[in-house]
A protein has these predicted regions:
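Positively charged, solvent-exposed patches that mediate nucleic-acid binding
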Residues: 1-121
Length: 121
């Protein structure tokens, strides 16, 4: 699972990507151009928990929940996607199973999960 690191990449995804909301988390997905030789072939994941998600302990827990849920779903995600998960306040009080269901549902709704033929979106 590759990480989105730079502020420029996060800003590009937030500006140009499509957003999908769930009560626990928001997903912003952006398909990278397939001909970009500077980008890795796999999908990249970024995790954000702003101050609206609670105190630092709650924000860190929310990001841990999101990372673990995304790690479990990463093999199903097609290549070439930049995905940013934004934690909402109720996520910090949620269980791992609830976070996993939310992430998996958002990935399906965004059509970034590979289907039976191995293609995504």
């Amino acid at each position: 699972m590759l990480g989105l690191k730079s502020a420029i990449d996060f800003e590009r995804v937030r500006r140009d990507g499509r957003s999908h909301a769930h009560p626990l988390v928001v997903l912003i997905a952006l398909r990278r151009p397939p001909t970009d030789p500077l980008q890795p072939a796999g999908s990249r994941f970024g995790f954000v928990a702003g101050k609206g998600a609670g105190i630092a302990v709650a924000r860190n827990r929310a990001k841990r929940l999101l990372r673990e849920a995304a790690r479990a779903c990463a093999p199903e995600v097609g290549p070439g996607w930049d995905l940013v998960f934004i934690a909402r306040k109720p996520l910090a009080a949620a269980r791992q199973a609830e976070a996993s269901v939310a992430v998996r549902g958002l990935l399906r709704r965004a059509q970034v999960v590979r289907d039976e033929q191995g293609t995504a979106g």
